[in-house]
Amino acid sequence: MRFMLLMLQLLGLLLLLAGGVQSVYCPAGCTCLERTVRCIRAKLSAVPKLPQDTQTLDLRFNHIEELPANAFSGLAQLTTLFLNDNELAYLQDGALNGLTALRFVYLNNNRLSRLPATIFQRMPRLEAIFLENNDIWQLPAGLFDNLPRLNRLIMYNNKLTQLPVDGFNRLNNLKRLRLDGNAIDCNCGVYSLWRRWHLDVQRQLVSISLTCAAPQMLQNQGFSSLGEHHFKCAKPQFLVAPQDAQVAAGEQVELSCEVTGLPRPQITWMHNTQELGLEEQAQAEILPSGSLLIRSADTSDMGIYQCIARNEMGALRSQPVRLVVNGGNHPLDSPIDARSNQVWADAGTPMHGATPLPSPLPSPPHFTHQPHDQIVALHGSGHVLLDCAASGWPQPDIQWFVNGRQLLQSTPSLQLQANGSLILLQPNQLSAGTYRCEARNSLGSVQATARIELKELPEILTAPQSQTIKLGKAFVLECDADGNPLPTIDWQLNGVPLPGNTPDLQLENENTELVVGAARQEHAGVYRCTAHNENGETSVEATIKVERSQSPPQLAIEPSNLVAITGTTIELPCQADQPEDGLQISWRHDGRLIDPNVQLAEKYQISGAGSLFVKNVTIPDGGRYECQLKNQFGRASASALVTIRNNVDLAPGDRYVRIAFAEAAKEIDLAINNTLDMLFSNRSDKAPPNYGELLRVFRFPTGEARQLARAAEIYERTLVNIRKHVQEGDNLTMKSEEYEFRDLLSREHLHLVAELSGCMEHREMPNCTDMCFHSRYRSIDGTCNNLQHPTWGASLTAFRRLAPPIYENGFSMPVGWTKGMLYSGHAKPSARLVSTSLVATKEITPDARITHMVMQWGQFLDHDLDHAIPSVSSESWDGIDCKKSCEMAPPCYPIEVPPNDPRVRNRRCIDVVRSSAICGSGMTSLFFDSVQHREQINQLTSYIDASQVYGYSTAFAQELRNLTSQEGLLRVGVHFPRQKDMLPFAAPQDGMDCRRNLDENTMSCFVSGDIRVNEQVGLLAMHTIWMREHNRIASKLKQINSHWDGDTLYQEARKIVGAQMQHITFKQWLPLIIGESGMEMMGEYQGYNPQLNPSIANEFATAALRFGHTIINPILHRLNETFQPIPQGHLLLHKAFFAPWRLAYEGGVDPLMRGFLAVPAKLKTPDQNLNTELTEKLFQTAHAVALDLAAINIQRGRDHGMPGYNVYRKLCNLTVAQDFEDLAGEISSAEIRQKMKELYGHPDNVDVWLGGILEDQVEGGKVGPLFQCLLVEQFRRLRDGDRLYYENPGVFSPEQLTQIKQANFGRVLCDVGDNFDQVTENVFILAKHQGGYKKCEDIIGINLYLWQECGRCNSPPAIFDSYIPQTYTKRSNRQKRDLGKENDEVATAESYDSPLESLYDVNEERVSGLEELIGSFQKELKKLHKKLRKLEDSCNSADSEPVAQVVQLAAAPPQLVSKPKRSHCVDDKGTTRLNNEVWSPDVCTKCNCFHGQVNCLRERCGEVSCPPGVDPLTPPEACCPHCPMVK
């Protein structure tokens, strides 16, 4: 028996284990504990297979982009679902099917833009939905119906602008609704929510956060401060309803339907239950009143009609009516056919005069509404509604049972309703339990049960009190609460959470006291105190008003000058900053008081706000109008000049200028501010930034550049708005494309638009008279290089053009904007289609000669030369987000994705934003005398001047300097082990944050002279190298010239760094790109040419220099000192973007630099152009689809209006191809030419960047003939048009120039790398082609002692007469010349553009000059020896004679003094040492000579014990080792 019992126990255990095997199944990459499955950062792209008993599922921080239908099938026990911080963009209908037990769902921090209407259906237990930080722009009707337990709905920081009417009205248990952070229009959708909240007696227990963005009168107003008077909403109601009608065939009939409602309802008509299609029935028309007019009725018009009126508040249906058309067979009282009977029965109302319908068929009861479980607050002040309604025949009876006992009649706490529902009044502890509703008739019964649960919410003990506070006075709000557990207290002001302690607002005593030290106007509003614990929350409110204390009134809106035409009505606005009792408003016209009560009322009218209306103006009504505000403490006034003109004097659009400008400024600034908020707002409660956001941040224009671009956008938008107003106001019939803005606006008003927008605030002409500076150094912003044209090559100026652009409207509209427009008889192909067909490649062939450093130097150089400012907003002027729309709406310029794209299937486009235009180009050129095409802004200086190291504006450059000492250094950041100085981190106020994944890294962005420094780690390493090189040079110059101040050291080091970059570019890098033939085209340097404009050409920046994309490897190799991979391995290109931490923590700059100089670049072949890392994976985590660099290059050329490939071939004296076979000489691949023909149709249609990269490379170069020509043209200008080019005589002395020509990037790596000991002599050529690697000591560098300044008092010796780096004061401290003064005498520009004539060459006198210098030094040395001997004699005599004798000896004539015997020493090296001379033969020994005897003392070093892992170091010029400081 015992054995049998043991066997049974063993069998039970086995069964238990067998049952548990299935339940403990855990997906790969996840952790499972009991019934919780956590798959955090498991790199999932879909929902894995899960155990069916899972209750909590955590899928955070994965890559799930879409949820299909039934994604969680079989998980009926799941209660909590975490899907936040994924990449969710789409939820298919039914994605959450089967989750009947779900209580909490987290969908926040994703990319959702819409939700299926039934996504949350059949979830009766759902308590909380978290949807914040998505892109949801619309909520479908009924989305939140049938969620009886939902108490928290969090949707802040989305894109909502409208709320559905009654969208939240069925959430009877809702306690918290957050909609803040959405630009919501407080219209009727908000009204329905407000009305439901206002009528709820428990509204004190419901927290709703919402701030109005529109209409303007409600802007920034919180939800709780809204009132009934703020809304204009009413449901539709019939004034005249339709009636039955009878008409003869061919006659006209009108079915009346007049409706009222706010907003005005839309009318539709139904015919036989189908919506009436008026476009298909020309004889039918809906009149403005809403009535239906049928002009010529026939038998097909017979049937049942119904009028439907809809607005935001709901829909209203009329009773169905019948129309009978008499053709002889259809009298009104004849029986209707079966189909009409059915239609009539469907409409649900008996028809007057029609055959009576049969009684309804008997049916058992079925529910139309049934009760749902609810959680009720204990001691709440409201009621609870349990719905119960049923239909059937006979009509069912409704009965209620509470905890099994029938409720026969209403009680003080339970109220039975006539419709069958039950209301719980003042719920208490006895109200908890089970409530059953039963519907019964003679054919059966049905029942439904609901559970009422009670929770004790926090109880407010002390509530804040509403107060009226005087301006500047302190006040305190107290709010204390009790509960179990003890609640916490939060505060809100006007619906916005208070951030905590600020300088003028303090939260004290665990947030129970809110203290404001000095009340200001922004402190006025509704304060909400919320006490919350795990059971829920309770809120109370108090209103604080801030009164102005005994001060004169202030004007919030002042009148402005205006021009009006005769016969119109003008409005002059005038409004106080706040209403107050006793405020008097008066107007005067040319000093005469205007009183509408005394003068003609039909002439003048003063509104309640204070505005003056002057009606039917005439010429005498012109003049100065003054508005005056007066109270008991003083007055305020403002005036405006009104000019009245006859109608013939004005252009049609003049009257709309200020209105259109105000609209434009608001639209542009809103788009810019939204973009700024998206890019730079505090991310403490948001997901870390993704690649695309970082790209936008680092390319986003700085303040000065942003203002320049903003002015152009406002100008352009103003003109568009003026045209809109003229069209609407004057009903002009002129076609849009025929508009000329000169016809719409007078010249005076064109200038007014320019002035308002800021386009007239052109850059002031720079002051170039400080030749002590400009003759030696570059300005930071590039001005004053060419003294005849000071802005040539300067930052924030327009690009230069080689050929006129081909904008579609002639001056601004990009190529391809108008769909279907033909070029050379063919449409422009999609840039994406061109990329996938001709450019992208997965295959990579290594180059046989050049290193990957060629690519990296090219990118670094490009960031010194050009940066086309992107649009200052990523939203269109009409509020469309370019990332989420495929609409062509400025500045959005998306790339169309063709059908059957190999990768992009879920989007129609790839988002691209246009480059900003400079004022005076495109549409903004209209206020000049001639229309100029749109031109883009170059944010950088055009010169090769190391602006990517130092910045492009004076303010930016100052931020990068270390101004704490006079050493001329650039700022450095924190120190990392075994690495030299790193770049400084970006300041918090810069809004830059590179921490994409806080588990992966917490490092901030670095900052340098170009804002794109963090784009990829190779570029970041290059910036770090040159920052270190500047500081190395500045420190060495400080040792050589200790009397130089910090500015001189900074400018001299900057000048040397810029010269090194010029030499490396022109002598070592460029020959490998353009080949020997290209260098012959460049020619030898013949000196500076002041007539040559060095500004960057648009074609160079947009097309030619982008050849470098074709030589990029998909991998960045990282090698150690032995040129083997580092332990962290190589780096895939797409992982190198915005990852500064990899530079600091994965080996520093050395491994990347070794990889660049040791690994070959990618070889460009006809079928291998751009690797797919750039066309298919670029910033794939940042956009709805990953970007495509090739497609963007093509689209950018079209945005800039680039002419076709053939235009530039002609410009470069290449053959102009008539067909694609004519290109065989440059594009040898017949397959490539055939694909080009299929895509473009004609060579004229080919995009210039594409044509350029597809050409075969010239011999010895990396570009084809076209790009060779364009590169030569630009680099020649950069060399010959630069007055401070390093080879221009006078820029450096001959000796210094010799040193600059020894500059070598390999030597720079040796000097400032962390641990470089061997490099190649030319880092751009593979080691095997130059004899392998060399030791660093074998690489020649620059000898900085040739910069030693030996002269004093501004009179240096002859050796430095050709170069005088004298110290100078800061430019900001110098007196600046007023350009308006004519009496200033300034040297002519020609004298400064030539080599400095006052400096002469003394090469022939070099030897004699040196001999004279040595002779003068010898004389000075003899004098010093003589004085020293006298001092020795005096000291020696003092040792043996009395002091008196010493005095006497000193007073005796020199010829009577006897000379003592000379004392000296000879050291171990044979050097003669004077008596008492002290010297150090080495760093540890000090010796002295005393009376012929050498005495030496050697320093002894003690034992050094360092922490584990730290080795003792002996610094230079030190004797003993010590432990280095570890940070």
Swiss-Prot record:
Signal peptide: 1-23
Gene Ontology biological process terms in this record: basement membrane assembly; collagen fibril organization; extracellular matrix organization; hydrogen peroxide catabolic process; phagocytosis; response to oxidative stress
Binding site for heme b: D862, E1015, H1109
Keyword Coiled coil: yes
Domain LRRNT residue range list: 24-53
Keywords: Calcium, Coiled coil, Disulfide bond, Glycoprotein, Heme, Hydrogen peroxide, Immunoglobulin domain, Iron, Leucine-rich repeat, Metal-binding, Oxidoreductase, Peroxidase, Repeat, Secreted, Signal
GO cellular component, one term: extracellular matrix
Transmembrane segments: none
Reported cofactor(s): Ca(2+); heme b
Active-site residues, as the UniProt record annotates them: H863
Entry coiled-coil feature ranges: 1403-1441
PROSITE patterns per the UniProt record, alphabetical: IG_LIKE, PEROXIDASE_3, VWFC_1, VWFC_2
Example of a GO MF term: lactoperoxidase activity
Manner of cofactor binding, per the entry note: Binds 1 Ca(2+) ion per subunit.
Glycosylation sites: N419, N616, N673, N682, N731, N767, N962, N1120, N1213
Location(s), subcellular: Secreted
The keyword Calcium is assigned to this record: yes
Entries under Gene3D superfamilies matching the protein: 6.20.200.20, Haem peroxidase domain superfamily, animal type, Immunoglobulins, Ribonuclease Inhibitor
Expression sites (tissue/organ): Expressed in hemocytes. Also expressed in the fat body and gastric caeca.
Function of the protein: Catalyzes the two-electron oxidation of bromide by hydrogen peroxide and generates hypobromite as a reactive intermediate which mediates the formation of sulfilimine cross-links between methionine and hydroxylysine residues within an uncross-linked collagen IV NC1 hexamer. Plays a role in extracellular matrix consolidation, phagocytosis and defense.
Protein name from the UniProt record: Peroxidasin
Originating organism: Drosophila melanogaster (Fruit fly)
Gene responsible for this protein: Pxn
